[in-house]
């Protein structure tokens, strides 16, 4: 515990909260253009080829975003919507591409959890 004299000399610093998605600049989503679409392998206990895209955002940042769901149509110059949310087994991937908006189509033949993959209700 500091003394009163120490607190007068040096006031307590407020705790600054650090954002987990700085490239969004406080916005819920951001638009961006894919500069590269590729696959990467996850961290140790897991094994797969995860689909990711390098995206240049309207905020000026160049980020790596995960493409969720089975199959996608994203390629270079695709315009996509990016939201926050990391992928635990991919280091450095702190964003998700929103499916079913702009150039990213929804997942084909998706029946459950459709809203997360941009799929309309089947007739």
UniProtKB/Swiss-Prot annotation:
GO cellular component: chloroplast; small ribosomal subunit
Annotated InterPro entries: NA-bd_OB-fold, Ribosomal_uS12, Ribosomal_uS12_bac
Family matches, as CDD domains: Ribosomal_S12 (cd03368)
Top-level taxon of origin: Eukaryota
Pfam families: Ribosom_S12_S23
Gene Ontology MF terms in the entry: rRNA binding; structural constituent of ribosome
One annotated GO biological process: translation
Principal place of residence: plastid
Gene3D superfamilies from the UniProt entry: Nucleic acid-binding proteins
Subcellular location as annotated: Plastid, Chloroplast
SUPFAM superfamilies: Nucleic acid-binding proteins (SSF50249)
Function: With S4 and S5 plays an important role in translational accuracy. Located at the interface of the 30S and 50S subunits.
Family designation: Belongs to the universal ribosomal protein uS12 family.
Complex formation: Part of the 30S ribosomal subunit.
Name under which the protein is recorded: Small ribosomal subunit protein uS12cz/uS12cy
The species this protein was found in: Phalaenopsis aphrodite subsp. formosana
Gene symbol of the encoding locus: rps12-A
